[in-house]
A protein has these predicted regions:
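Gly/Thr-rich phosphate-binding beta-strand-loop-beta motif of the actin/hexokinase/Hsp70
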Residues: 2-21, 110
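Short, glycine/acidic-enriched loop or turn micro-motifs at the edges of active sites
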Residues: 12, 62, 86
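Short glycine-rich, Thr/Ser-proximal phosphate-binding strand/loop in the N-terminal lobe
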Residues: 13-38
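Short, basic/hydrophobic alpha-helical segments
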Residues: 38-55
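Acidic, metal-coordinating catalytic cores used for nucleic-acid/nucleotide bond scission
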Residues: 57-67
Length: 178
């Protein structure tokens, strides 16, 4: 059956959408959709009117994509939210698109990526996505905690070199265990 790849480049208040089929067939050149119920419902109507299988791909950048992804999932469409790095690597290798970031090109890139990775596209679910984000936040938290300890030790060592014995002048207030 026909494959319709919908690339959505989400930004604040609006998205740019492009629809491709295999063999470079352009179903819809990049067009803009505002994030209001009327225009989003219009997009849903358009997507649902396509013959064949349809998959929607967007990147998780910023926080704007979440609203759009959840809206499109709620009406029963296949939505995949992918890591921007994957798309960037893919487009650098496979597409000879002139450099320069434009939303129009990005929506086409996303649709092309969707066609290329058609069978591996993960279905977006709010739960699994939340888990992914929590893992990332946890990783970041741990990195910053390590960095904080490193910087404190560095500061103590510098203080020690500049003013030997100065560390003994400071008392650390008793801390309650976390």
């Amino acid at each position: 059956s026909l494959m319709n790849a919908v690339g959505i480049d989400v930004s604040k208040g609006k998205s740019t959408v492009a629809i491709l089929r295999p063999g470079g067939e352009v179903v819809a050149s990049p067009f803009e959709v505002s994030h209001n119920p009327r225009e989003l419902n219009g997009l849903v109507t358009l997507i649902k009117s396509l013959d064949g299988d349809t998959k929607i791909v967007m990147e998780y950048t910023g926080s704007y994509y979440l609203l759009v992804a959840m809206f499109l999932r709620k009406v029963g469409l296949f939505v995949s939210v992918v890591n921007p790095i994957l798309v960037k690597d893919y487009s650098n290798k496979s597409l000879t698109v002139r450099k320069g970031k434009t939303d129009k090109k990005d929506s086409i890139k996303l649709a092309a990526f969707a066609l290329d990775r058609w069978n591996e596209l993960p279905l977006f679910s709010a739960q699994s996505h939340t888990r992914t984000l929590l893992k990332a936040f946890n990783r970041q938290y741990n990195q910053y905690t390590k960095l904080k300890v490193m910087l404190k030790n560095n500061l103590i060592s510098i203080l020690d070199q500049a003013f030997p014995g100065a560390n003994t002048l400071f008392t650390t207030p008793a801390r309650k265990a976390d």
